[in-house]
Structure formats: C-alpha cells, structure tokens
Amino acid sequence: MTPPPPPPPPPGPDPAVDSATDPCPEPQSLVVLFGATAGALGPDLGSDETDLILLVWQVVEPRSRQVGTLHKSLVRAEAAALSPQCREASGLSADSLARAESLDKVLQQFSQLVSGDVALLGGGPYVLCTDGQQLLRQVLHPEASRKNLVLPDTFFSFYDLRREFHMQHPSTCSARDLTVGTMAQDLGLETDATEDDFGVWEVKTMVAVILHLLEGSNGQLFSKPEVVKQKYETGPCSKADVVDNETVVRARGLPWQSSDQDVARFFKGLNIARGGVALCLNAQGRRNGEALIRFVDSEQRDLALQRHKHHMGVRYIEVYKATGEEFVKIAGGTSLEVARFLSREDQVILRLRGLPFSAGPTDVLGFLGPECPVTGGADGLLFVRHPDGRPTGDAFALFACEELAQAALRRHKGMLGKRYIELFRSTAAEVQQVLNRYAASPLLPTLTAPLLPIPFPLAGGTGRDCVRLRGLPYTATIEDILSFLGEAAADIRPHGVHMVLNQQGRPSGDAFIQMMSVERALAAAQRCHKKMMKERYVEVVPCSTEEMSRVLMGGSLSRSGLSPPPCKLPCLSPPTYATFQATPALIPTETTALYPSSALLPAARVPAAATPLAYYPGPATQLYMNYTAYYPSPPVSPTTVGYLTTPPTALASTPTTMLSQPGALVRMQGVPYTAGMKDLLSVFQAYQLAPDDYTTLMPVGDPPRTVLQAPKEWVCL
C-alpha cells in the first residue's frame, strides 16, 4: 500500500520579506540529538576516548511547533567493553552492541531519516541541537577522524541548548552547569518519570524545553549556531600580539615527524585559532615533541584539556595548561620578510636543510623540479641567514596543496651539487623560531664575567704519593670511596680526595687521592686494585702530584703517557704576555652582592717582580673547573672554584719578560673569524680601564698578532 503524500506546508510569511524584516530568522527545523559512549557520561563525555554506542534524535519544526518521529540507533563499537557507569545507565550489553551497525552506516541512516522527517513537517534546512558541546566536539568529530570518515556538513554547525537556555534565563546557573533535568525543572515542565529507555527521556525532555523557549522567544533564540572548523588555518603571529592565558595548552609526547596539521587533527572538533599551532624546537633547531596550541576561547581550551593522554597513532599525548606569553615566545616574530612570506593563506610549508652555502633560488627551484612548483616561484622561498648575511643552509618553501608538498617530500635526501638535502614538513611557528634564533644570536654571546681567580698552588713533585681511581660508578660518593679503600682511608691526607668532572660538569668516573707517603700510596694501590664497587671493578694506580694537577686542569693521563692540558699545547705565539698599569676593576654593585669580598679584586695592586702564568680549565665556554675537591681540603687543595696557577716547576721554563705591574689579562678562545673589535669590546662592556693606565703597547713576538688601542679598552687580536 502506497503511503499518502505528505501534507503541504502551512502557509507562512514570505521568506524574502521575513529575511528583510527579521535580522536573525529562526531555522526551518531543529534536530534534537543525544548520544552516549561506552565510557564516561555527562560532562566527561568523550574524555576517555571511547567509541560512540548510541544515537537518539527527533526533529522539531520551530514555526509550526510540530515534532517528528523519535529514532534510536545503536552503534557497533570496536572496543565492546562497557564501563560500569554506562552499563548501569543504559542497560546495554556487549552482545547487543556486537549486532549493531557501524558508525558510517548509522550516519547514513541518520541523514536519510532526518531528511524524510523534515520533508513531512514541511521544513527546510535543518540544524542540530545538542545538550552541551561534548557530543559533537569530543565524540563524533574525533572518532570520525580516527576512522577516516567524512561527516556531512550538517555536523559542522549546531545549537547548544544550554547556551540558548541561559541566554533567555540569565539568572540561572552558568550554562556549563546546566543539565536537561535542571532546565526542565526551572521551566516548571512535567517530565515522564516512568520512561526508562536510555536516551529517550533526554530527547523528549529537550524537545519540551525547546518548545517552551520558542513560545517566549524574542527573535534572538536559535539565531547564532556554534561552528566547528573544518580546516586548520595557518598564519603568522607577531611578538606584539596579546594572547589570553586561558586559551593556550601545551601538548607533549608528539611524534618528531608530526606537523601542525597532525596536531590539528588530534584536536579535531575544537576550534584552533589561525596560526595557533606552534611546534617547539630544541637548542639544535630540531623538534622536541612538544607544541603550544592556541584556541579561539577558553571553553575550547577546557575541552582540549580533557584530551589528556588521548592517542596519536600508538603514542599518547599529554595536554597541560600553558600561558599566552609562552605561545608568543615560540610563535611570535618581528621580521617583515617572514610576515610577508607567511601572509599567503592555505599554503603547505616545507623546510629544506643542508643546502650548499652558494645555493640560490634558481638552484632550489631546479632541485625541486617542475613537478612540484613552489608558490610564487622565488618569492615562495625564504632563506635563513646569519645576522651578517652568511647563509645557514636552511630554507623554507611554500606549496599550494598537499599533493605538491608530497611530491616535494619525495626529493628527501636528493643531491644538490655534492650535498644531499633533507626535506621536512614545517609550520609558521617553526619558521619564526628558526629565524628568531639566528637573528638574535650575536657573534660573541655576552656572558656573565667569571669570578676573579684566587691563587691556591698545588704542591708539585715527582714522588708518586697519590693514587688514581679509574672506573668509578658515576653515582659513587665520597663515603663510597672511603669505604672502598678500607684501612687505607686512614692514610689519606686532610682534604686529599679529588673527584674529576667531565666537560658537562658530571662525574667522569675518575678520582685522585693524596696519601701520606709514597709507600702508603703504593700499598693502597696493591691492596685495592681491581676491587669491586657497586658491580664495577675499579683500577687503582699510583701517580705523582704533578700528574694529578695536570689532569685536574684539563689534561689526560692514560697508559700511553701524560697529555698536557689544552693551555700547555704548542701555540703560534709565546705563552707570555707583558702587563701594564691597572686600576681597580670596575665591578657592578649587583655583582659584588653575589660573591664574598675575598673573591673580588683588591682595591689596589701590589707591584710584583713576576706573575705566575694561569692554567685555563678547558674550552672557553666552561666556566667551572673540571674537578671537585672533597674530604676536607688541606692547604694544597682549593677551597673555591677558579683558575689554578702553574706549579713552581713550570715557572723555570717560562721567559722572564714581564712588566713591573701585573695586569688583568683575559685570553679568549674560539673567537669567530668574522668578529670585529666592536664584537670583542661588547663582551667587556662593564669592565673598562681608565685612559691614563695604558701608555705603552705590549711587546709581542708574532708579527701577525697586533695590539689595538681603544679609548677605554685594550684588544689584542
């Protein structure tokens, strides 16, 4: 039997006239939608990343106040295990869910049934209406993204019944705290308390609330739907931008190859601000697995925090609160060139690394080839350079679509000249970070001046009255060493235990111990050699004080012999420097408050016939000694960290060409070849000398080395 045709729609106002007179026309139809997952319900819906198991919906025609048929559909979940809360509230079982349809088929049925009901009611385009935002933003969109399903356009806009209710009844509690039951209670509606079908009572009550709200509507109700962004939009961020602290989160644990689009997909359903994904880089310019994400409002940020420990592939991602200042620090920039480069919308950014320094736009475009053209040709390339204009070997390229970017990525590790080029996906924030890092790095970083040295000579000698412990556990303490030596610990000199640190300031596994005599040092070595300490055997060998001091100052002592510290290696010029008259050093007041007076220069220098040379502890970036003295220090061990003076035996071999007054000389190692005098002087800007204190030039023995005289500084290049 053929069903009768649907009745014609009731006469209504002319749409053209209505749209002209009513700036906010009501929608033709509303689809009240309720859903549940196999896990948490209520405000925590979707926070546990469980699959959707139930959809209940009913159509409401606002103009005629008619309602359609109520529909309920189960959804087959991949993980059929139900939480106790869901099992108790729904009464469902794993067997009933196993016989249900998959999500894609349920969505097809939903579209067909809703279209039929809307046609029967004489409505037009319809909009979804839900109780809160969790169902669409936290459940449907993320699950569809995980399963690679394409949602209909109708799922990208909806009305939040709680927000519409709060708009008409602002005296109630906040929209976030409302529920279907509290809304019906505030309106004085009678609900069917006997309805025990899970989801049906909620939809019927929501329909009753909507019809009651429509009766007292002033034309503003159901006029501004919530929008779910379909695509993440890239864009630049300026250092001058003000970012609300309540809109930023930090995601940690991202795969190193993930892009901003991957991060946006992880937060699918939430509205990320334009250019709101900033991947963080480490000190080497590589991604560290973290990202800062900026959302359009605080409500989106709160929903993002509920995705803590959700999965991206096989990895779970941690989500924490962050600040707007952190986001601007990572994503913000000040370069107009970068702003113009990033001003093109809907572009895919790739980073090229390892370019030859002589490569130009023509070379890069030829490397990529005609099959993957760069947007704008040479204008779509951005080369990263040092502050002095030298190329770094990095560049960024823009591509119009994902297909062209994929074609360019196939050139990964392709050859350009004699070098292979690496290609990676990039983001606008990464462009800003890389450019900011190179633009802000000076030729010579200005470091805080180290403490001025206090001499504490080590007693030199060739007698092997010390022992060296090699192969110590890195966690070994002074107590472990004393326990390891046993009875020999009683023969240690006061303050005679010295731990050796590596270039990073961590224990190196070596230690030196000063014994009372050569005989006791030999006895300790014979008794303790290759004894076990914490599952490791330790070598104990005798050595002299001179050998110990050289190792502590940066040299090495191995089976092949003694290697001197770096400062004692052969150099182009003699290791002696003439000195000049010097006034008291100008030390800032804030610096003097940090250190004891004994660590600062005296008020006036005392003339001396000769000044011992200084040993340098290692590279110029090392501001600490590479040893630590324990077990209380004797007169022969340092009590503060600083530079060591040379042993007395080293003074006999040094020339005696010295001036009558000792000067404050500083030796700088690792200076860039392009550094000029201004770069050198900027390092010592707080330690100038008076102009009357240098009247002569320092004699040098190497013609290429020259002395430059400045109004307030001495510079020896």
Swiss-Prot record:
UniProt note on tissues of expression: Epithelial cell-specific.
Compositional bias segments (type: Pro residues): 1-14
Residue ranges of every copy of the RRM domain listed in the record: 247-343, 348-428, 465-545
UniProt protein name: Epithelial splicing regulatory protein 2
Keyword Zinc: no
Domain of life: Eukaryota
Residue positions, PTM Phosphoserine: S83, S563
The gene coding this protein: Esrp2
Biological processes per GO annotation: alternative mRNA splicing, via spliceosome; branching involved in salivary gland morphogenesis; epithelial cell proliferation; epithelial tube branching involved in lung morphogenesis; positive regulation of epithelial cell proliferation; regulation of RNA splicing
Species in which this protein is naturally found: Mus musculus
Chief location bin: nucleus
Keywords: mRNA processing, mRNA splicing, Nucleus, Phosphoprotein, Repeat, RNA-binding
Matches recorded under InterPro entries: ESRP, Nucleotide-bd_a/b_plait_sf, RBD_domain_sf, RNaseH-like_sf, RNaseH_sf, RRM_dom
Lineage of origin: Eukaryota, Metazoa, Chordata, Craniata, Vertebrata
